[in-house]
């Protein structure tokens, strides 16, 4: 492969993480598993630099490790019908994040920094159960975090996770919130439970917890822990050999664990059930779109195109 030209030799904030995922279900049946993966932690302002500097990383172009802006949060103001203003605009993840945060009352300036912890495409395939955005002001002050939760139906739902008032951890500030899920993630978890997001700014060590809770009880504990690695061609190859086709491994593990839960007799919920509880979803599945269309028709509202996220109140103001 031809040598990739470098843009500069400035130190990068972007990195990789060699990590371990743990799931421990407490109710209604005990179930436990864990496995190793690797993730990318990408400074959104360094994506083009990484594309130029690395042989095995590409932005919006085919490569072994590939980041596509369109795999993540769509711009809420550009996801409707094409018009003169947006028909030629390419997806831009930072612009999309700024627009969504603005709807939540949070201003992310152009010179503010964002780290995105995510699974990139590996050999062209991607599946992300959850990605995390860590937003920092240009001054270095922590602003907020966003959890972008995906599911096997291709939907996305972002959750705003505010700065936690507790003292900073060893690697930086933490973020936490307990918020109603109102989203179909697993067929074995009700829609009306809450997510308890406990996020630590990625540093030398990675520690994230996302638990399912209901009426003060933990139903499912999930942790993501790991160690920081440099983002270099050599490290990309090493981790790719140690965790081959990791994105395929993740989606395969999801279906395998679902089979095990079904065999254990854990109650199962269809996605078409409770569509009224699936709120604030981007790229909504047809089951939600059809339910919304029927509701709109019955109400004779005639408003909205249905191409953006389905309506949802600010989760920060919902009672859990």
Task: Please name every model-derived segment.
Residues 291-304:
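Long, low-complexity Q/N-rich tracts
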Residues 2-291, 308-320:
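Mature, function-bearing regions of proteins
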